[in-house]
Amino acid sequence: MTPHEIDIALGMEKYYYEDWNELDGTIERPNGFKVIEEIDFKPAQDWKGETKGKYAVFLLTKWGIDHFSAISEVQKVLHSKVNYIGIKDANAITSQLVYIPLNEKQELIEKYQSRSFILKFLGFSSKKLNHTGNIFEISLSISDFDIVIERIEQIKKNPYLPAFIGYQRFGTRRPITHLIGKYLLRRDWEKAFYLILTYPFLSESKETIDIRKLIMEGDFKEAVRSIPSKFKQEKLLLKNYMRFNSYYLALKSSFIPISLYLDAYQSYLFNLYLSRKLDEYKNLNDKVNLLIRIPIYFNNCDDVCKEIYLDEGIERNFFKLQEFKISLRDLVRKAFMNIRDLKVNEETKTISFVLERGMYATILLREILRGDPRKFT
């Protein structure tokens, strides 16, 4: 089966099981998609802190809010820079540990609740938290659940799937983060700026589409008045462009770290490479230790990598963005993800499983359900 056009646009050109057809299944978001950080092979909420230490550790449970907005809110509540282990899905119910450095004036909050997250103090720690993976529980709305069970049973016999970098890295509703990264690396500040603020997608709300159209038409004053506060990135960039009349200086003020856009472009290159090597890799016995390296230097590429780089127009020093003091490194990542504790509840039509840090549940859903990823992301 040929993957969906969104998959192709994100570099995911193949499935592992080529003969499976599309299933008409959806997931109710955020309630049907739960993610719990796994610390020392236990759920985050079971983490036991010490009575004292260098860091105060909290359990952050959030829903319907993106990672950076949630962290920004938590920092205001705790009056401190907040550290975290991983970036969790915005359109899900997620639980993870966050921690802050202690100082003499620090006043700790036992519990805090807002409309989109709950923060609960768990204890102290002086050592690095051992993030062993993420636990997923996903409820499907589907009539052909018997086929889902069959596919899961087949995957359990060989619990490895391609470790594609999932939709969240590129934007689930506007999958263009990697393109923004590409234009940043080309130093086309204007194109990167307008990709962030304009180019509306039909999956967005009418209000958002109308605002993006205002910016496209050059009506910045009306657009900046109309942008809801939750769109922090768009509002900040537009305000700073109006202030400095410079796309570069506007991008320098980015609420979202510029490095995330560049990482997304590297992720796209990884997906392309894995897609084109997948038939070869599927036949290898050792899927546990197989690593892929996406180098920053053309001369370190193999033939497949060189072909991709030539197609993309990647030149010498392409991965150095000195204007933002960013130098990317080689991207090294496992070729396959191991799916642990894969279980099915036929009564509730729920599947649960554990993935290593940095692996994406939506890639398992993609393999099982096929078709338009907007149904399950």
From Swiss-Prot:
Domain of life: Archaea
Residue ranges occupied by any TRUD domain in the UniProt entry: 160-377
Keywords of the record: Isomerase, tRNA processing
GO biological process, one term: tRNA pseudouridine synthesis
Enzyme class: isomerase
Assigned EC number: 5.4.99.27
Catalytic reaction list: uridine(13) in tRNA = pseudouridine(13) in tRNA
Pfam families associated with the record: TruD (PF01142)
Catalytic residues of the enzyme: 89
Keyword match Isomerase: yes
GO molecular function terms attached to this record: pseudouridine synthase activity; RNA binding; tRNA pseudouridine(13) synthase activity
Keyword Isomerase: yes
PROSITE patterns: TRUD, UPF0024
Function: Could be responsible for synthesis of pseudouridine from uracil-13 in transfer RNAs.
Family classification: Belongs to the pseudouridine synthase TruD family.
Protein name (database record): Probable tRNA pseudouridine synthase D
Native source organism of the sequence: Saccharolobus solfataricus (strain ATCC 35092 / DSM 1617 / JCM 11322 / P2) (Sulfolobus solfataricus)
